[in-house]
């Protein structure tokens, strides 16, 4: 099936007399005819549902759809994008481990890596993703267990050289985990370029309507967990009577462990209602992303010529330093998110934001309505001046998420805000 068809049909195939649309299974638990059947479920000897924290039919439909769209082997949905990043990393990291991350990451991800993981005894090295591969390799240590980056960085809008980072991960004998939230699988499928795990904040473009909080982790099924560095997957798990994930579940070992161990113990499971809304949102993903891209490209070109704008970050512009990477990894389009530096810094940025009329001021991003934000005083507020600089966030940087409204209405609102900010 082609991508657009998968958006509609993957994950749920109703049989004779069943609902045409995946129903909401609003139940915490499930009944069985015998105690033996339940016992097999708990020992992972049989597939099925026994508690919604671990699995739910509505959520499973969303997971299977995401797996099909990303080209992986299995997916686990979570209650939020932040919990997806946390679980994806914690599934293979423990006290004493080290990992490498691009410095161009979302503020919440930066805080998780730099501060929360530090309290857990896990150390990160942030690297400049523009450095040559041989320079990046200098960050590798014997205990390096993962490499992390974002396909399109939030909010710097830098495009990742996925193949270069895949080579870095291979040199470290570690998996490459990529947050594909901004690109979506419609424009880029990182697994095809060497990524091993793909993460989403499904609250963004996959849902598309800012109505359902959620996250997802997709296992590419293409990493060798038996290389001696990941005993969590390749040696017996005593909580399941000595089960070895790599032996029992093969290519899906990573995601099964995340579900039956991390979700079991930490419990950031999505609500069935949110999974239903995510399923509905993904049905129109291809149509929405095309409109987001068209609007953002037009807005970026408008901003690039505007006298009150110092700089525009959008890889779709031929003047962008990442234009060649965009052509390689995202040849058919980009997200609807732009960031730009307004002349006058923080004070002028506030005036511009306050003057917006149709465009809303909000923390969210990547949904059907146009919205704007000042990262330095919101999503990245906890970062120091040095950390902000490392992440590419200046005092005058504004993040603009272009919705699917008529482009003339978007441009008119932006222009009147510029006039008010003079």
Language-model segments: which ranges?
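N-terminal glycine-rich, Lys/His-bearing helix-loop that initiates the first secondary-structure elements
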Residues: 1-46
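PLP-dependent enzyme catalytic core of the Aspartate aminotransferase-like
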Residues: 114-115, 123-125, 138, 142-145, ...
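Glycine-rich beta-alpha junction loops
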Residues: 11-12, 26-32, 221-222, 282-284, ...
């Amino acid at each position: 099936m082609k991508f657009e068809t998968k958006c509609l049909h993957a994950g749920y195939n109703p049989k004779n007399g069943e609902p045409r649309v995946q129903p909401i299974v609003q139940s915490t638990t499930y009944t069985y005819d015998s105690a033996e059947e339940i016992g097999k479920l708990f020992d992972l000897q049989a597939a099925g549902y026994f508690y919604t924290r671990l699995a739910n039919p509505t959520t499973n439909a969303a997971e299977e759809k995401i797996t099909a769209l990303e080209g992986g082997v299995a997916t686990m949905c979570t209650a939020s994008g932040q919990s997806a990043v946390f679980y994806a990393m914690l599934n293979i990291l423990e006290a004493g481990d080290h990992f490498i991350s691009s410095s161009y990451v979302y503020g919440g991800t930066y805080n998780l890596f730099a501060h929360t993981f530090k309290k857990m005894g896990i150390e990160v090295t942030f690297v400049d993703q523009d450095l040559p591969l041989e320079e990046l390799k200098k960050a590798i240590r014997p205990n390096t267990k993962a490499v992390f980056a974002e396909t399109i960085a939030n909010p710097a809008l830098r495009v990742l050289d996925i193949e270069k980072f895949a080579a870095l991960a291979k040199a470290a004998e570690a998996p490459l985990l990529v947050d594909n939230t901004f690109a979506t699988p419609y424009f880029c499928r990182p697994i095809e370029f060497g990524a091993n795990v793909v993460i989403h904040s499904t609250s963004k473009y996959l849902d598309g309507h800012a109505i359902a909080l959620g996250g997802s982790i997709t296992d590419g099924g293409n990493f060798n967990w038996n290389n001696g560095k990941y005993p969590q997957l390749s040696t017996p798990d005593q909580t399941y009577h000595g089960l070895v994930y790599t032996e029992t579940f093969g290519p899906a070992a990573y995601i099964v462990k995340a579900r039956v161990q991390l979700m079991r113990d930490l419990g950031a499971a999505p609500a069935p209602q949110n999974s239903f809304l995510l399923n509905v949102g993904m049905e129109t993903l291809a149509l929405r992303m095309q409109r987001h891209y068209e609007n953002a490209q037009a807005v970026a070109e408008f901003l690039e010529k505007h006298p009150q704008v110092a700089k525009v970050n959008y890889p779709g512009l031929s003047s962008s330093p990442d234009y060649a990477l965009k052509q390689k990894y995202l040849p058919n389009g980009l997200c609807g998110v732009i960031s730009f530096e307004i002349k006058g810094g923080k004070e002028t940025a506030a005036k511009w934001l306050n003057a917006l009329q149709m465009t809303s001021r909000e923390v969210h991003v990547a949904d059907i309505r146009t919205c704007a934000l000042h990262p330095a005083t919101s999503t990245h507020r906890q970062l120091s001046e040095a950390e902000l600089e490392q992440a590419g966030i200046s005092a005058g940087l504004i993040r603009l998420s272009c919705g699917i409204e008529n482009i003339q209405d978007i441009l008119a609102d932006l222009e009147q805000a510029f006039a008010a900010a003079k």
